Regions:
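Nucleotide/phosphate-binding catalytic cleft detector across ATP-hydrolyzing
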Residues: 1-16
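A mobile "lid/hinge" subdomain adjacent to the ATP/sugar-phosphate binding pocket shared
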Residues: 202-246
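Short small-residue beta-strand/loop micro-motif enriched in glycine and branched aliphatics
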Residues: 47-50, 194-196
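Glycine-rich phosphate-binding loop of actin/hexokinase-like ATP-binding domains
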Residues: 148-205
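Glycine-rich phosphate-binding loop and adjoining helix at the ATP-binding site
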Residues: 50-151
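Hydrophobic "anchor" residues
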Residues: 46, 102, 171-172
Length: 246
């Protein structure tokens, strides 16, 4: 869409604005046990959102049920879908954003799934796969707290341990799925096996589920601990830490 720009001398400038009405993209967030679908206009206006149960499955069943969920979404909301331009998929997993392959996941027993290619074959639109932490960092660099910064490091400790890096304005992954997988850096000799296949990963030591397990063990060894007064959650753990009571 063209609109006139105000000029003081010479020929008036003509600005351009993206016409987003009817042009859409689909966001799919892979959670632990569910898929969140969000259909949006190119200006990020939400059209429709829905959540589908997605139980733990092996690699073959994962891909089959993922494609089936996409079918169900389009059938359910076919009257709301217009000109679909792309599909984005984010998840907590070891992924290769270049090839669109999921290597492994903390939530599902899957390995080496070419998810982006399979969905693109089915839908005919471009598909982008990215680790949720990296996608979050990209969003912060474009629209959030880190806007206008060219060098960004974001570290997230949640169900997973991950990092998003932007250097000189570009997202760092160096054509590799493991460039900033800090959660899978070996930090300790341990028999605890990570879903990536290795042992002693940082994620097996400091992710929130692991911290809660350690707190539960610590509470059992200390009957007078404040942690024994409530169910141990990340909130009660943080509260105990603020009070410096173990």
């Amino acid at each position: 869409t063209e609109f006139p720009g105000l000029g003081f001398r010479g020929r008036p400038a003509v600005g351009l604005k993206l016409e987003s009405k009817g042009w859409q993209f689909l966001c799919i967030r892979v959670n632990n046990g569910s898929l969140l679908f969000s259909l949006r206009e190119l200006d990020n206006q939400l059209v429709v959102e829905d959540t589908f149960d997605f139980p733990k499955q092996n690699s073959d069943a994962f891909l089959h049920h993922f494609l089936a969920a996409i079918d169900t979404f389009f059938q359910r909301y076919q009257s709301r879908v217009e000109r679909l331009t792309a599909i984005s998929i984010t998840m907590n997993a070891i992924v290769d954003p270049i090839s669109g392959v999921i290597y492994s996941s903390p939530y599902y027993a899957i390995q080496d799934i070419p998810l982006a290619d399979k969905i693109q074959e089915k839908t005919g639109v471009a598909v982008f796969l990215q680790h949720s932490v990296t996608a979050w960092t990209m969003a912060e660099s474009l629209y959030g707290a880190a806007k206008n910064n060219t060098d960004i490091l974001q570290i997230v400790i949640d169900d997973i341990v991950g990092a998003g890096v932007v250097t000189n304005g570009k997202t760092l992954h160096s054509n590799s799925h493991s460039a900033v997988e800090i959660g899978h850096t070996k930090v300790i000799d341990s028999q605890t096996q990570c879903y990536c296949g290795a042992k002693g990963c940082l994620e097996t030591e400091i992710s929130i589920p692991q911290l809660i397990k350690k707190a539960q063990h610590l509470a059992q060894e200390n009957p007078t601990s404040i942690l024994n007064q409530y169910p141990i959650t990340v909130e009660t753990l943080c509260d105990a830490d603020r009070k410096s009571v173990v």
